Amino acid sequence: MTKLEDHLEGIINIFHQYSVRTGHYDTLSKCELKKLITTELVNTIKNTKDQATVDRIFRDLDEDGDHQVDFKEFLSLLASVLVTAHENIHKE
């Protein structure tokens, strides 16, 4: 497995580490998303402890309005985080 493929598998595994806790095993509830963000993205997303921030992120990600974030919706967050990280690297 290449380094990139290994990282992709890691992202999937982290998603599932949190998605299996409550409700459907392949989606994140708001509580699961908050736990993932506050644990895994604490240095990347500002105000992760603020419930209003988590609510806004969840609302933005939940494109179909089912009160769950599936993997495809979660990828929107990762894409945004990666773009910001890439831009920040070039600022340094």
UniProtKB/Swiss-Prot annotation:
The cross-references to Pfam families, in alphabetical order and at most eight, read: EF-hand_1 (PF00036), S_100 (PF01023)
Which residues are Cu cation-binding? H16, D26, H86, H90
A GO MF annotation of the entry reads: calcium-dependent protein binding
Q: Which InterPro entries match?
A: EF-hand-dom_pair, EF_Hand_1_Ca_BS, EF_hand_dom, S100/CaBP7/8-like_CS, S100_Ca-bd_sub
What PROSITE patterns does this protein map onto? EF_HAND_1 (PS00018), EF_HAND_2 (PS50222), S100_CABP (PS00303)
As for membrane topology, the entry says: Peripheral membrane protein
Q: Which residue ranges does the record annotate as region Hinge domain?
A: 38-53
Query: Where is Zn(2+) annotated to bind?
Result: H16, D26, H86, H90
Its main localization is: secreted
Provide the binding site for Ca(2+) 1. Answer: S19, H24, T27, E32
Positions that bind Ca(2+) 2: D62, D64, D66, Q68, E73
Keyword Zinc among UniProt keywords: yes
Q: Where in the cell is it found?
A: Secreted; Cytoplasm; Cytoplasm, Cytoskeleton; Cell membrane
Q: Name one GO biological process term.
A: inflammatory response
- Domain of life of the organism encoding this protein: Eukaryota
> Which keywords are on file for this protein?
Calcium, Cell membrane, Copper, Cytoplasm, Cytoskeleton, Immunity, Inflammatory response, Innate immunity, Membrane, Metal-binding, Repeat, Secreted, Zinc
Q: SUPFAM superfamilies annotated for this entry?
A: EF-hand (SSF47473)
| Example of a GO cellular component annotation carried by this entry | plasma membrane
Q: Which residues form the EF-hand domain?
A: 16-48, 49-84
Instruction: Supply the domain comment.
Output: The hinge domain contributes significantly to its chemotactic properties.
Primary role: S100A12 is a calcium-, zinc- and copper-binding protein which plays a prominent role in the regulation of inflammatory processes and immune response. Its pro-inflammatory activity involves recruitment of leukocytes, promotion of cytokine and chemokine production, and regulation of leukocyte adhesion and migration. Acts as an alarmin or a danger associated molecular pattern (DAMP) molecule and stimulates innate immune cells via binding to receptor for advanced glycation endproducts (AGER).
Instruction: Give the quaternary structure.
Output: Homodimer. Homooligomer (tetramer or hexamer) in the presence of calcium, zinc and copper ions. Interacts with AGER and both calcium and zinc are essential for the interaction. Interacts with CACYBP in a calcium-dependent manner.
Record protein name field:
Protein S100-A12
Tell me what organism the protein belongs to: Oryctolagus cuniculus (Rabbit)
